[in-house]
Amino acid sequence: MEQPWPPPGPWSFPRTGGETEEESDLDVSPSSSHYSPVPDGGAQMYSHGIELACQKQKEFVKSSVACKWNLAEAQQKLGSLALHNSESLDQEHAKAQTAVSELRQREEEWRQKEEALVQRERMCLWNMDAISKDVFNKSFINQDKRKTEEEDKSQSFMQKYEQKIRHFGMLSRWDDSQRFLSDHPHLVCEETAKYLILWCFHLEAEQKGALMEQIAHQAVVMQFIMEMAKNCNVDPRGCFRLFFQKAKAEEEGYFEAFKNELEAFKSRVRLYAQSQSLQPVTVQNHVPHSGVGCIGSLESLPQNPDSLQCCTPAPLCSVDSVVHKEDDDRMMDTV
């Protein structure tokens, strides 16, 4: 029996006239010939699970920046103080050592917490009764029909700049990414990070692992920039150059934190896909769709980080038109 196909995500926004053939090959939006309709309940459950995974990823990156990057800052400061022998610096040296010890303890506490969460995900048996009840409670029948101004702004942004965000997601060089964000500073925002994260889950569900890894790199880049800005209490558009400066120099501590989080994120994406027992199926019925309202179905999902421990949804499926590796390579070459 054919399993329900995932609902439209941010990749389903209307395409511009200049879209290349390779880009359309990656499109499984409702307007695509690869699309298969899905019951409302299945769509809600899939979208809910992806949204929870997205929120969890934000929490992991927040911890990485708060602990690991601050630890690198403290170690760097401690190293600079060690170069001086003045007794007047003894007090500063002691304070720096204390800060390093505290940050190491926080890092270890978070590492244990992360391991426990991953283990729980591996052992979890999805409670379908709880899922069905949760989906019903959060269905469009019980939702407030009035959208907030913030939700409307986010939806409009992702729809307006989808092609630019996709372009950024395909960049692989630090200099290219920094130059692109310098030309498009408005893309340094939470909406861009969210789009890229959701795209990663979508690509892994489609068994496009190589392309998922490319997009994952850029997703974590944007998340680190946003969390750096929050941690320093500055506008992210004013600090993204600092991130690339440290990344290109591969500064000890900073770059290691980024690489570790990138690998952890890719593992979480794969783990989520495996936990759903994804099975490619043949889509026989192609139903054209205008794609109107796709954003709303995504943005209306719950945003409460406390609900991250909830069960995730029932199995989803893939299509038989999986893009070959050479198609992915051509896609990267066109950017």
Swiss-Prot record:
Which residues are reported to carry the modification Phosphoserine? S32, S88
Alphabetical UniProt keywords: Chaperone, Coiled coil, Cytoplasm, Phosphoprotein
Family matches, as Gene3D superfamilies: Cdc37, Hsp90 binding domain
- Asked if the Swiss-Prot or TrEMBL record annotates the protein with the keyword Coiled coil, the reply is yes
The region called Interaction with Hsp70 is annotated at: 266-335
> GO CC annotation: what is one?
cytoplasm
Its subcellular locations are:
Cytoplasm
Could you name the domain of life of the organism this protein comes from? Eukaryota
Which cysteines in this chain are paired by disulphide bridges?
none
**Region Required for interaction with STIP1: start and end of each range?**
277-335
The UniProt regions of compositional bias labelled Low complexity, in chain numbering, are: 27-40
Which residues does the annotated region (Self-association) include?
Answer: 2-170
Instruction: Write out the function statement from the record.
Output: Co-chaperone that binds to numerous proteins and promotes their interaction with Hsp70 and Hsp90.
Assembly and oligomerization: Self-associates. Forms complexes with Hsp70 and Hsp90. Interacts with CDC37, FKBP4, PPID and STIP1.
* Protein name in the entry: Hsp90 co-chaperone Cdc37-like 1
* Organism expressing this protein natively: Mus musculus (Mouse)
Please name the taxonomic classification of the source: Eukaryota, Metazoa, Chordata, Craniata, Vertebrata
